[in-house]
Amino acid sequence: LQSWGRAIRCETAEISNDTKALLFALDSVFGLIPRVLASYLLRPFASLIGEGALSSEGLTTMDFHESAARRPRAIGIACATAAVALGLAYMGVAGAPARYLGINLVALAIGMTLLGLVGRVMLAGPRWAGGTIAAMAGALLATALLGDDVDGAVRWVRLGGLSIQPSLILLPLMVVAFARCRDALATAGMIVAAAAMAIQPDRAMAGMLAAGLGVLAVMRPERHLIAALGASVASFAATLVRADTLAAVPYVDQILYSSFDVHAAAGAAVLGGSALLLVPAIVGWRRDPANRDSYAAFGFVWLAGIMAAALGNYPTPIVGYGGSAIIGYALSLLALPKLTGAGVGVDAQAAGEAETTPLDRHLLVGAA
């Protein structure tokens, strides 16, 4: 911004008429105000694209946007943080208990911590993706068999007095990871997960599973993928046959509509926060054609979650009360590439790869 200030001063000095010079200076300053605001608003996320990104010697705001667009995980962190903030604004206006707001904030911190820690493990051993998917499927099946029963639905486990929904935490990551790892073990894991959703039963999560696998099958039909899709469709059909009698929970279910009864701004916050969840998929789809499978799965998984919340008494992801979806969204970012290769050469890609290790160190700082 200092360079812009010097340019304005030089241009003003060349204008002989004092009135015109003053008007030019004022017009230029007003034009810079949006850049100044953007610079300060984006500063918490500067660590995601490198130190000094917003300094006078570093990137301009436009450069920041360009660099951030090549980092899907960084975009996801920013969107998750903003969506949680909008959800907190809604709950605050709606009169939700302060404990609800605190739980969502803690869930965001946990999600970002896991994103940083687990991200390093995945870099060290990506070959274990199939086994990881199978292990998560086992956890979902255990929940269906041993979890808390609420009006015939067995979707939750209790930890320290809190109920968490493992399917909201694990299933999005499983689907997006399956876009990049479709071996026999991963396929078996997806089939077990589909069975778990039918046993629970959980219509919303079964629909999320079918939506994510469906878009993958359309983009790249393969034997393992078709088998997993068939199981997910059967699971979703099974949940449709069984009645879902759970009542709506305040600040959790149906808030895409009820928020407008509180205030128009509260409704706009809920809708805006929900839309932010899809931004990483949209940006990644346009910027990184080589990994479109992952972005499509990510986008359809969370779109299905939002649609389920709109159509029935199911949790509204991120913007409603509940930490499971917040943690699940953060974990699902693990399956997205850290750095896209769009618009960069071989040397720049190598430099970008070198940046991925320090990027992990800054995930929590950027999220704060």
What does each model-identified segment do?
Residues C10-K20, A25-S39, F45-I49:
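Short, low-complexity, charge-dense intrinsically disordered segments
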Residues G76-C79, A83-T187, A194-Q200, G312-P317, ...:
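Membrane-helix boundary/helix-loop-helix interface segments in multi-pass membrane proteins
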Residues V106-G111, A265-I282:
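Hydrophobic alpha-helical transmembrane segments
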Residues R155-L168, Q254-A268:
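Short aromatic-rich membrane-water interface segments that cap or initiate transmembrane helices
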Residues C181-A195, R203-A237, Y329-L333:
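Hydrophobic alpha-helical segments of polytopic membrane proteins
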Residues A193-L216, L240-A247, F260, L311-Y321:
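Helix-loop-helix junctions and helix-breaking kinks within/between transmembrane helices
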Residues V283-G299:
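Membrane-interface helix-loop-helix junctions at transmembrane boundaries of multi-pass membrane enzymes
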Residues L331-A368:
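A juxtamembrane structural motif centered on a specific transmembrane helix
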